Every structure is written in structure tokens, then in C-alpha cells.
């Protein structure tokens, strides 16, 4: 099962509270409602383990995908286009990485 991992920071002009409220009320419910997605979680990064330097990203999204071709279709819908446009108003240069689990449960 592929996993989409998204790393990002908020834009300087984005409100943390507005983004986190939007993520909980719009982003997560919409994405978890897609037939191609089994699970979706958003994580606030609190720091680098064992280091005093700041983390390079403030947020991480983890999207467990059950069908990558179906996800491509799902994200091209009008609803997801609107959600994506809203996401872009909050985020600064998000990085979308596709990963495959090869070890562990």
C-alpha cells in the first residue's frame, strides 16, 4: 500500500489557528472520505529529536493510499480542487513524497 507523505511549513502570512482549524474541519474529513484513502493524519512537528536546532518542517501529513490510480482520479475532482487551493493558501512549498512500506506491520 503506498503512503503519501507531505512535509510543509505554513506561509508567513498564514494563521496557525486558522490552518489547524481548517485541517480538522475540512482537510481531514474530505480526504478521509475519498475511496482511494484508508487513513489520513496531520502531525505538528515539535522539534528534532536529540537536537536544539529547529526542524526543517512544521507539519507532516501521512496519507495511506489503497489505490494510487484512484487517488489521481479523486484529487482531480472539483471538491478536491477546492481543498487543494485552500491548502495552498496556508502552505509554503509543500513536498509530496510517495513511499512504500517494506518492513514492519
Each language-model region and where it sits:
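Macromolecular interaction modules
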Residues: 1-105
Amino acid at each position: 500500500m503506498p503512503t503519501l507523505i507531505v512535509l510543509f511549513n505554513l506561509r508567513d502570512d498564514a494563521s496557525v489557528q486558522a490552518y489547524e482549524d481548517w485541517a480538522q474541519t475540512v482537510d481531514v474529513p474530505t480526504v478521509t472520505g475519498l475511496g482511494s484513502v484508508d487513513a489520513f493524519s496531520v502531525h505538528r512537528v515539535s522539534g528534532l529529536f536529540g537536537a536544539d536546532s529547529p526542524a526543517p518542517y512544521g507539519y507532516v501529513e501521512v496519507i495511506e493510499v489503497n489505490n494510487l490510480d484512484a487517488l489521481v482520479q479523486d484529487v482531480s475532482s472539483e471538491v478536491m480542487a477546492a481543498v487543494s487551493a485552500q491548502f495552498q493558501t496556508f502552505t509554503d512549498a509543500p513536498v509530496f513524497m510517495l513511499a512504500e512500506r517494506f518492513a514492519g506491520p
